[in-house]
Curated annotation (Swiss-Prot):
Species in which this protein is naturally found: Streptococcus pneumoniae (strain 70585)
Family, similarity comment: Belongs to the adenylate kinase family.
EC number: 2.7.4.3
UniProt protein name: Adenylate kinase
Enzyme class, first EC level, given as a word: transferase
NCBIfam families associated with the record: adk (TIGR01351), PRK00279.1-2 (NF001380), PRK00279.1-3 (NF001381), PRK00279.1-4 (NF001382)
Annotated positions binding ATP: G10, A11, G12, K13, G14, T15, R128, T137, F138, Q195
GO biological process, one term: AMP salvage
Underlying gene: adk
Keywords for this protein: ATP-binding, Cytoplasm, Kinase, Nucleotide biosynthesis, Nucleotide-binding, Transferase
Stored SUPFAM superfamilies: P-loop containing nucleoside triphosphate hydrolases
Length: 212
């Protein structure tokens, strides 16, 4: 089974990816893991990627696409299939993936799209607060401290609502054309992500069982 998993930051994509891998025994291919493995193994694309990272530069698409192709060419993929997580991030990468899969003779069988209302994600992602003295982490809504005094806590820049909203807006703008691209191919399975983790996986499991 050859799959993509998509969803906005905070939608629970990582949790569900781990459950899919455990239940269906597919190879979990995440962008971070791919880059690390390619650099450690000093593959052609890994060496190239490291040269950009060492200079503090963004890795160009052609290198990222090359690393994906290297990984999808490995023998375990033929045996287990894959779950691609964190790629493609842009419509250009989606087109590159189409080309790579065609060249390797691999058919993409499904795209799991975990849908959560962006407002819910904003609340979920921007609620983290940290105690100034102890460094303990809490959440304003889901795990509030017992004796909350605003002056005793701070937020990391990444967790501030305006930063989170910008990140979500970028992800929505990049993700919508990708979803539309795969929806036109009849590959997208929308999953309601605003429910219990186990219920989300139950819905995914039903979809994937029908794909087998």
């Amino acid at each position: 089974m050859n799959l993509l998993i998509m969803g906005l930051p905070g939608a629970g994509k990582g949790t569900q990816a781990a459950k899919i891998v455990e239940q269906f025994h597919v190879a979990h291919i995440s962008t971070g893991d791919m880059f690390r493995a390619a650099m450690v193994n000093q593959t052609e694309m890994g060496v190239l990627a490291k040269s950009y990272i060492d200079k503090g530069e963004l890795v160009p698409d052609e290198v990222t696409n090359g690393i994906v192709k290297e990984r999808l060419s490995q023998d375990d993929i033929k045996e287990t299939g894959f779950l691609l997580d964190g790629y493609p991030r842009t419509i250009e990468q989606a087109h590159a993936l189409d080309k790579t899969l065609a060249e390797l003779g691999i058919e993409l069988e499904g795209v799991i799209n975990i849908e959560v209302n962006p407002d819910s994600l904003l609340e979920r992602l921007s609620g983290r607060i940290i105690h100034r003295v102890t460094g303990e982490t809490f959440h304003k809504v889901f795990n509030p401290p017992v004796d909350y005094k605003e002056e005793d806590y701070y937020q990391r820049e990444d967790d501030k609502p305006e930063t989170v909203k910008r990140r979500l807006d970028v992800n929505i703008a990049q993700g919508e054309p990708i979803i539309a691209h795969y929806r036109a191919k009849g590959l997208v399975h929308d999953i309601e992500g605003n429910q219990d983790i186990n219920d989300v996986f139950s819905d995914i499991e039903k979809v994937l069982t029908n794909l087998k």
